[in-house]
Design a protein with these regions (language model features):
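Accessory beta-strand-rich segments of carbohydrate-active enzymes
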Residues: 2-4, 11-17, 37, 54-162
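Predominantly extracellular/luminal regions of secreted and cell-surface proteins
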Residues: 10-41
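Helix-terminus loop motifs that line ligand-binding clefts
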Residues: 42-44, 57
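Surface-exposed, low-complexity/disordered Ser/Thr/Gly/Pro/Asn-rich loops and linkers
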Residues: 47-55
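Short, solvent-exposed loop/edge segments of extracellular or virion-exposed proteins
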Residues: 48-49, 162-165
Length: 165
C-alpha cells in the first residue's frame, strides 16, 4: 500500500451550496489546509443549538473541495481515501457521486473510491460536513475536517487495513 497526504489546498465554503452560480457566494470560497475547524470561525450566539457546551458557537453546513490527479497507472489498482476525523455527518462525493455518508465524527474511516474515478485525469472530491444534530457533545467538538486525509492505492487483492486483529 502506498499513501499520499492530501491535506493542502482545499477549497472551503461555509453555508448551504446553491446549484446556480452566484458571484457573492463565489467570494466566500477560500483555500484552507487541514486540519481545519470552521466552528471556531463562526458567530457566537446565545441561541446556538449546543448552548454553553459549544461555547455558544454556531455551526451550519460546510463544503471542502479538491481536485486530485489519479494517474493512468493506477487503473489496475484499488484507490481509497482514508479520513482520520471529520466532525460530523460527512458525505464524501467523488466526481458528483456519493461514495459514503459517515455519521460519527470521532471514528477514522476509509472509502473505496475506485468505481468513481477517471484514471489519467483530475477528479473532484467534495466533502460535505453537516453537524446539524445539536447538541452532539458535552464539550466543544468543533466542526470540519479536524485530522488528515490520505490517498491510498494498492493492489486490488489486498488485506484490508482493519482486516487483521
Amino acid at each position: 500500500m502506498r499513501n499520499q497526504n492530501i491535506d493542502q489546498c482545499w477549497q472551503f465554503q461555509h453555508g448551504l451550496y446553491d446549484e446556480f452560480p452566484d458571484a457573492e457566494k463565489a467570494k466566500s470560497i477560500r483555500e484552507v489546509n487541514l486540519p481545519h475547524d470552521y466552528m471556531i470561525e463562526s458567530n457566537v450566539s446565545e441561541s446556538a443549538a449546543s448552548g454553553p457546551a459549544s461555547g455558544y458557537y454556531t455551526q451550519g453546513v460546510a463544503y471542502y473541495t479538491k481536485l486530485i490527479d489519479i494517474p493512468q497507472e493506477w487503473e489496475q489498482e484499488a484507490v481509497y481515501l482514508h479520513f482520520d476525523g471529520i466532525m460530523m455527518n460527512a458525505t464524501v462525493d467523488i466526481n458528483g457521486c456519493k461514495a459514503i455518508l459517515q455519521h460519527n465524527g470521532y471514528i477514522p474511516f476509509s472509502v473505496n473510491i475506485t468505481p468513481y474515478l477517471y484514471f489519467g485525469k483530475k477528479n473532484r472530491v467534495t466533502i460535505t460536513v453537516a453537524p446539524s444534530m445539536q447538541p452532539n457533545s458535552r464539550w466543544y467538538s468543533g466542526a470540519g475536517i479536524f485530522r488528515s486525509i490520505e490517498l491510498l492505492h494498492m493492489p486490488k487483492l489486498h488485506i484490508a487495513s482493519d482486516g487483521i486483529f
